[in-house]
Amino acid sequence: MGESERSEAFNPPREAGMSSGDIAELEQLRREIVVLREQLEHAVGPHGSVRSVRDVHQLEARIDSLTARNSKLMDTLKEARQQLLALREEVDRLGQPPSGYGVLLAAHDDETVDVFTSGRKMRLTCSPNIEVASLRKGQTVRLNEALTVVEAGTFEAVGEVSTLREVLADGHRALVVGHADEERIVCLAEPLVAENLLDGVPGALNDDSRPRKLRPGDSLLVDPKAGYAFERVPKAEVEDLVLEEVPDVSYQDIGGLTRQIEQIRDAVELPFLHKELYREYALRPPKGVLLYGPPGCGKTLIAKAVANSLAKKMAEVRGDDAREAKSYFLNIKGPELLNKFVGETERHIRLIFQRAREKASEGTPVIVFFDEMDSIFRTRGTGVSSDVETTVVPQLLSEIDGVEGLENVIVIGASNREDMIDPAILRPGRLDVKIKIERPDAEAAQDIYSKYLTESLPVHADDLTEFDGDRAACIKAMIEKVVDRMYAEIDDNRFLEVTYANGDKEVMYFKDFNSGAMIQNVVDRAKKNAIKSVLETGQPGLRIQHLLDSIVDEFAENEDLPNTTNPDDWARISGKKGERIVYIRTLVTGKSSSASRAIDTESNLGQYL
């Protein structure tokens, strides 16, 4: 509505008959309306609605900003409050009095415990948070400033190492020996007591995954002040030298030693399998067997087969499953027994026989096998740089036939220099049976070859065709041909010419130095040649020519091996005994004569290897 329209609305025509007084009052009202309208327009303005919305938006934005700042301040205050609480806890923790530790000795029904702490034995109370029934003897416990048990820990992990002499009758104490040979009685922590009680659990000793019973010679972790032994410490010094597992080797795996196998079975198996007959005839079983002969002829292999066969025979006698047959084969690595410290070698020997007696007390046969016996039990007085054999040999003698008898234990020794072993060990009553493992002859060599050349091997088609596809006949012919080639006394097989001290000369062939190890090496070479032939020609199968070529290669590798510096010592190791050898000349085809060497002075035999 315009200004003129508004004026006309409030200005009626004069001819309406209004009085002058009414008109004056109307004008006064009109002026007041105009003043009020001006005031309103001045307060709101012509665009009042738009300005009001803009102000509202600005206010809302400011409110949002203030709200965000307020939230951030609240989060900062919360974080500061948490840090303050953590710092307060840290201050409280740092301000706590120190805690002591002790070893639990015993627990009582009145919720008190005996604890060894600070060199004193004390009876203390326990915190309500501690279950006294769950505490175990030997356990470490934490004490507060009031000497109250507030926490149960683990068992002590550090301390002195002592050797177990024996477990006392109560099963909770043991006699141990310290470093200075001081004997003391200590209590066994509950884990050790539990291990020692496994003797009554069926199959506990046969399960390697479970703890075993304590035995003399074990190393124990001991706290001498508290008087407790906490755990058994593995001993590398003896554990590495002894192999208790029975090797999976049978007499059927050994070729060419039928007579020797029968001898050792008579010496070892008969006394264990027919104890009643031995008692009836008042016959004492042999205590030991010596296997001697040149290297690589099966001494160690026979010893392994003895343990395997004996375990199975004992299982048959007892009616047990032969697959679960159990016996103990203590394989002693001779040279590793030697120790630079005086008395250590003797101590190791004592520990070995202690273990053997313990196993034998269960009624299970135990074989103690000393490989390379000449390295540790030499003739007394022959040492050059030391006289260790003067005490090591008597220690073995006292163990074999000392005051303590060896029941169900037999000692087997192996050596290629039996002349260097002390005679006191070899006398009857100690190593009663002496079996010579000789080099294989042609017949024995065929038997050995048959162990490696079996019908399961792939044979070349051309060789099979010669025998009309008969694989067994082809393998047999291969063995016969390779043995004939190896044992033929032809110029190509000549090896050495030796001159004895009396002037006699003798030509030796490779067959005189053959061994089971050499035969195995020949077969392995032939198999490798067959594989190379497959890769080159694509024709699979083993051929006779592969074996013949392997013999030539094997002989060629051995032509430089004879020791021409000390020929007599070399000959003794190789199995040639008798007249002293002073001169060796190699006769291998193509070998120059410069390889021969004369020995003008006689060497001290048995001194150098």
Swiss-Prot record:
Domain of life: Bacteria
Record-listed ATP binding positions: G296, C297, G298, K299, T300, L301
Pathway involvement of the protein, from the record: Protein degradation; proteasomal Pup-dependent pathway
A GO term, aspect molecular function: ATP hydrolysis activity
SMART domains: AAA
Gene Ontology terms describing biological process: modification-dependent protein catabolic process; proteasomal protein catabolic process
PROSITE patterns in the record: AAA
GO annotation, cellular component aspect: proteasome complex
Pfam families per UniProt: AAA, Prot_ATP_ID_OB_C, Prot_ATP_ID_OB_N
Region: Docks into pockets in the proteasome alpha-ring, residue numbers: 608-609
Region Disordered: start-end pairs: 1-22
Coiled coil: 20-96
Keywords attached to this entry: ATP-binding, Chaperone, Coiled coil, Nucleotide-binding, Proteasome
InterPro entries from the UniProt entry: AAA+_ATPase (IPR003593), AAA_ATPase_domain (IPR050168), ATPase_AAA_core (IPR003959), ATPase_AAA_CS (IPR003960), NA-bd_OB-fold (IPR012340), P-loop_NTPase (IPR027417), Prot_ATP_ID_OB_2nd (IPR032501), Prot_ATP_ID_OB_N (IPR041626)
Transmembrane regions: none
Known partners and oligomeric status: Homohexamer. Assembles into a hexameric ring structure that caps the 20S proteasome core. Strongly interacts with the prokaryotic ubiquitin-like protein Pup through a hydrophobic interface; the interacting region of ARC lies in its N-terminal coiled-coil domain. There is one Pup binding site per ARC hexamer ring. Upon ATP-binding, the C-terminus of ARC interacts with the alpha-rings of the proteasome core, possibly by binding to the intersubunit pockets.
Function: ATPase which is responsible for recognizing, binding, unfolding and translocation of pupylated proteins into the bacterial 20S proteasome core particle. May be essential for opening the gate of the 20S proteasome via an interaction with its C-terminus, thereby allowing substrate entry and access to the site of proteolysis. Thus, the C-termini of the proteasomal ATPase may function like a 'key in a lock' to induce gate opening and therefore regulate proteolysis.
UniProt comment concerning the protein's domains: Consists of three main regions, an N-terminal coiled-coil domain that binds to protein Pup and functions as a docking station, an interdomain involved in ARC hexamerization, and a C-terminal ATPase domain of the AAA type.
Family statement: Belongs to the AAA ATPase family.
Protein name: Proteasome-associated ATPase
Organism: Mycobacterium leprae (strain TN)
